[in-house]
Amino acid sequence: MIAKKPFIQKLSDRIVVNVENSIVSAGNSAMDVLERSPGVNIDQNDVISLKGKAGVIIMIDGKPSPMTGVDLANYLRGLPSATIERIEIITNPSAKYDAAGNSGIIDIRMKKDQRIGVNGTFTAGYGQGIYPKANTGTTFNYRTKKINVFGNYNYAYRVGLNHLLLDRNFYESGVYNGGDLKDNYSTSPFSSNATRLGMDFFPNKKTIIGFVLNGNFNHYTRNNNNSSIVINPQKQAINTFNSRATNNDHGNNVLGNFNFKHTFDSTGKELTADVDYGVYNSSSLTVNSTRYYKLDGSSLQPDYTLNGDQDGELTFKTAKVDYVNPLKKGAKWEAGFKTSFVSSDNDAKFFDVSSGTPQNDVNKTNHFLYHENNNAAYLNASKEFKKFSLQVGLRGEQTNIKTEQRIGNVNFDSTYFQLFPSAFFNYKIKEDQTLGLSVSRRIDRPGYSQLNPFLFLIDVTTYATGRPGLLPQLTWSYELSYTLKNLNFTASYSHTINNQNIAIAKFRDAFPNIPSAENVTVQIPINLASSDYVGIGIAAPVRINNWWNMINNGNLYYEKFNGSLGGTNLQKGRPVADIRTNNSFTFKKGWSAELNANLNTGAQYGFMVLDPQWGIAVGVQKAILKNKGTLRFNVSDIFWTNLPKAVITYNNYIEKWHAYRETRVANLTFNYRFGSNKIPAARRRTTASEEERQRAN
C-alpha cells in the first residue's frame, strides 16, 4: 500500500489542501475545490472570502492572478482540478509576500512532473448536474540533467446555472413605498482552452534559468431571463416586465515569465529574479431587451432594447529580485525589491435601439483608462534558538495611480506610501507542544473593475458601477497558535479601516443628474469606517483505524462592521461557526472512498446577513491498469442544500434573495499516468507578478 498525503494538512504557517489525492475533487474545477476548502466561502457575486473576511489574494504558482470578479471566477471554473497539485491557504504571510490581501493568500500550486525522462498524464471527465460539464487534458514533461521541458493543455466545457429570486422593498421615512418581485434564471455556457509551456535550463549545479508561457482563452455566454412584478405602496401588483439579456464574452490572456536562480554555496545563500509580462484582452457584445405588460397581459409601454459593445485590455509588467543569506547559529536575513506597471483600457459603447435606429446612450457609453505603478522593498531577519525561533520583517510599498475618464473628462490621481511590519514567534514547549504568535499589517487595494465608473445595466431597475476614488483597506492581524501532537488551535484578531463593501443605493441618490424611475437601484463599492474580527479555530486529524482517517476543521468567529450609508448606520456583527470534516477510506484491491461535509451557520458582510448552509459530498476511486490509471466517481452536495440565501437591510430599503445554483453534480473522471518513475529534487517556481494578476479587470 502506498501512503498518500491527507486531503487537508495543517502546517505551522498554512493549511494545505492536497487536491491531487482527493477523490471528491476529481472532475471538478478549481472554483469547486475552493468552495470545499477550510474557511473559504464564495458569495453570489463570486467574491471569495477567508474565515468570513473578504480581500483574498488568489495566486497561481506564487503569481497573483490579475483577474477579479467574473473574470477570475470564469478562469477558476475553467481550471480543472486534475491540473492542481495542492492549494495553500496562508492567513498571515511574511514581509516577503506582497502586502496585498486583507484576509490572506490562497496559492494554487499546479502539477509539475519531476521524473527523469519523458512523462505525462492524460485526464478525461464528464459531469452532469442540471446541465453537462466536461473536461479533458494532457501534461508532458521531458527532463535530463541539463534541461527540463514541461507543458500542458486543458479543455473545459461547463454550463452554469444561477436561478435568483429577489424580493425588493422600498421605504420612505419608515413607510412602505412599493417594490418588486424578481425571478431571474441565468445559464452560462462556458468553454476554456488553457495551455502552459516552460523550460528550465541547468548550466551548472548552482544555477537555473527558466521561462514559462501561459495562455488562457475563454468563451463565455450569459443567457439571462428576468421576470419582475411591480408592487405599489398598497402592496398590490400593478404591472410586470420581462427582460432578456445575452452577453457574448471572449477573453484571451497571455503571460510570459523569465526566471533565474543562483545558489552561492551549501549554506543556502541564493539570489532569485523574475520578470513577467502579461496581456489580457476581453470583449463583450450585449443585447438587453425589456417588454412591459399590464396585469391582463396587454402592452403597458414601448419595448426597450439596449445593445452594448465593450472592449478591454490589461497589460502588466513586473520584475522582482530576492536574496537569501543564511548566517551562523541559525540566523538568516532576506531582502528583495519589486516594481510593477499596470495599464487598463476599457471602452464601452451602448446604443438604444428601441426605435429601430441605434442611438448612442450617453449615460452608459464611457472610455476609462487606469495606470498604476507599485514599488516595494522588504527586509526579513530570523533566528533559530534551541527552544524558540523569531522572525521580524518590514516591507515598504509606494503606489502611484492615474485614471482618465475620457467621456466627461474626469481624472483622478493618487500617490501613497505604506509600511507593513510583520513578526513571527514560535516556542517549543515540549517535543509535541508548540506555541506560536504572529502579527502583520496588510493592505487590500480595490480590484480594477471596482475602480471602473462604467454604468452596467443588469435589468431596467438594477445597475452596477465602480468608483475611481475607492480607498484601499488596511488591516492589522494578530494570531496565537498552539499545537499539541496532531491538534492545532488558533485564536486571531484583526482590525480593518476603510473596509471595502458592496452597497445598494437608490439610483437617484447616486446619480442625481441622470433621469430614472422611482425604485431603481445601483450596486456600488464603498468604504465603511472599520471592521473588527475575532475568531478561534481547531484542526483535529483523527485516525479511526488503519482504513479510516478523519480530518476535522472548525472556525468560530465574530466580525463587527462600523460605518454608514445614506442615513443607515451600521454597528452590527454576528457569531459564525464554520465546520468541515473530511473522511478518507482505504480498502483492498485498489478501492478507496471519501466523504466530506460542511456547515456554515450564516455570516454578516456589511449590510448583508446570510442564512446557514450545509452540504455533503461523496466519492469512490479504483486503481486500474497496473496502478497507472485511476477511475473516480463523485457527487457533490448530494442533498442540494449548499445554496446561499440572504437579507440586505438599510433604513429605506430591504432586499431578500435566494440563489439556486448547480452545486449538485455527479462526476466520472479517468486519469492515466505514463513514463519513468525516477524522481530528482523538485523545483517550484514563484514569479514576480504577485498582486497584479489578482486585481485585473
List each model region and its residues.
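Short, acidic, small-residue-rich periplasmic hinge/interaction motif at the N-terminus
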Residues: 1-23, 43-45, 51-55, 90-93, ...
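N-terminal periplasmic accessory domains that precede
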Residues: 30-33, 72-74, 89, 101-123, ...
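Extracytoplasmic beta-strand/coil segments of soluble accessory domains associated
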Residues: 31-68
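Short acidic/polar hinge/loop motifs at secondary-structure boundaries
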Residues: 64-91
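Surface-exposed extracellular loop regions of Gram-negative outer-membrane beta-barrel proteins
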Residues: 109-124, 163, 167-170, 181, 400-402, 431-477, 494-518, 638-651, ...
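Face-selective signature of the C-terminal outer-membrane beta-barrel domain
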Residues: 194-218, 243-404, 428, 432, ...
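Outer membrane beta-barrel strand-and-loop segments of large Gram-negative receptors
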Residues: 307, 316-320, 361-366, 471, ...
